[in-house]
């Protein structure tokens, strides 16, 4: 399979290039960065593109890829419901290309979200803390947003988090994502980390995942690259590829 990388000179993108080049069943075709022409992907007969760019350009990238029948595996964050609906419209109008967008490709991070969803209904309190390097463009992270939404879905019908806070500084209790408080930390020296804290009478449970190196994303990305042609249209997350129950 012929694979290109958008954002190839970025820290994550360069890691993806190395991962593709190390895979016996994949061929790296070309890397494209800011200022480069996307047509290089067509000229090199690229079949699948890995996109780790920026929220400000990812939609234009996807429109080009879909229009040219190139599959896309996207790790760029900043996808709102409106953006996802737009991608679905493009895919419906141009059958033949598939897109997989995941808030996190680290297998451990995906499993931690799955575990959090399973635990959610057993605890009366839950909060999410995500910690990243200071160059990250969005807050909260896509992983934290998805985690909170999965938890909220699992807690449907349950009372809201107990919280007697009546005064305080704006933002002190974090962002509210479907009723789940989410707190963002940006700190030099970090890569990508998340804690989900659960509490109930007499006990707490913490589910934590740490990506200490960007190579943690490679196995999940390459799994998506190998499976993308089997999943027409838009796929969110790599959970469907992991056979999680």
From Swiss-Prot:
Its main location: cytoplasm. Its EC number is 1.17.1.8. NAD(+) binds at residues 7-12, 75-77, 102-105. PROSITE patterns: DAPB. Pfam families: DapB_C (PF05173), DapB_N (PF01113). One of its GO terms (cellular component) is cytosol. (S)-2,3,4,5-tetrahydrodipicolinate binds at residues 133, 142-143. Keywords: Amino-acid biosynthesis, Cytoplasm, Diaminopimelate biosynthesis, Lysine biosynthesis, NAD, NADP, Oxidoreductase. It is an enzyme of class 1 (oxidoreductase). It is found in: Cytoplasm. It comes from the Bacteria. One of its GO terms (molecular function) is oxidoreductase activity, acting on CH or CH2 groups, NAD or NADP as acceptor. It catalyses: (S)-2,3,4,5-tetrahydrodipicolinate + NAD(+) + H2O = (2S,4S)-4-hydroxy-2,3,4,5-tetrahydrodipicolinate + NADH + H(+); (S)-2,3,4,5-tetrahydrodipicolinate + NADP(+) + H2O = (2S,4S)-4-hydroxy-2,3,4,5-tetrahydrodipicolinate + NADPH + H(+). Transmembrane segments: none annotated. The active site is at 132 (proton donor/acceptor), 136 (proton donor). Pathway: Amino-acid biosynthesis; L-lysine biosynthesis via DAP pathway; (S)-tetrahydrodipicolinate from L-aspartate: step 4/4. GO terms for biological process: diaminopimelate biosynthetic process; lysine biosynthetic process via diaminopimelate. Catalyzes the conversion of 4-hydroxy-tetrahydrodipicolinate (HTPA) to tetrahydrodipicolinate. Belongs to the DapB family. NCBIfam families: dapB. This is 4-hydroxy-tetrahydrodipicolinate reductase. It comes from Mycolicibacterium vanbaalenii (strain DSM 7251 / JCM 13017 / BCRC 16820 / KCTC 9966 / NRRL B-24157 / PYR-1). The gene is dapB.
């Amino acid at each position: 399979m012929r694979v290109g990388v958008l954002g190839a000179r970025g820290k994550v993108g360069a890691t993806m290039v190395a991962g593709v080049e190390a895979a016996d069943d994949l061929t790296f075709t070309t890397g494209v960065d800011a200022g480069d022409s996307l047509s290089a992907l067509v000229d090199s007969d690229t079949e699948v593109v890995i996109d780790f760019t920026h929220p400000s350009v990812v939609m234009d990238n996807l429109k080009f890829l879909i229009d040219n029948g190139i599959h896309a595996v996207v790790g760029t964050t900043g996808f709102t419901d409106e953006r996802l609906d737009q991608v679905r419209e493009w895919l419906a109008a141009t059958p033949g290309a598939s897109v997989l967008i995941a808030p996190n490709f680290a297998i451990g991070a995906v499993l931690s979200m799955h575990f959090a969803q399973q635990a959610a209904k057993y605890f009366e309190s839950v909060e999410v803390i995500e910690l990243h390097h200071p160059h990250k463009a969005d807050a909260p992270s896509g992983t934290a947003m998805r985690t909170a939404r999965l938890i909220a879905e699992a807690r449907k019908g349950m009372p809201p988090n107990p919280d007697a806070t009546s005064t305080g500084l704006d933002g002190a209790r974090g962002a509210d994502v479907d009723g789940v408080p989410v707190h963002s930390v940006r700190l030099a020296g970090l890569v990508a980390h998340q804690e989900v804290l659960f509490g109930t009478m007499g006990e707490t449970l913490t589910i934590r995942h740490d990506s200490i190196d960007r190579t943690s994303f490679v196995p999940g990305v390459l799994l998506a690259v190998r499976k993308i042609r089997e999943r027409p249209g838009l796929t969110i997350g790599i959970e469907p590829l992991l056979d999680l129950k």
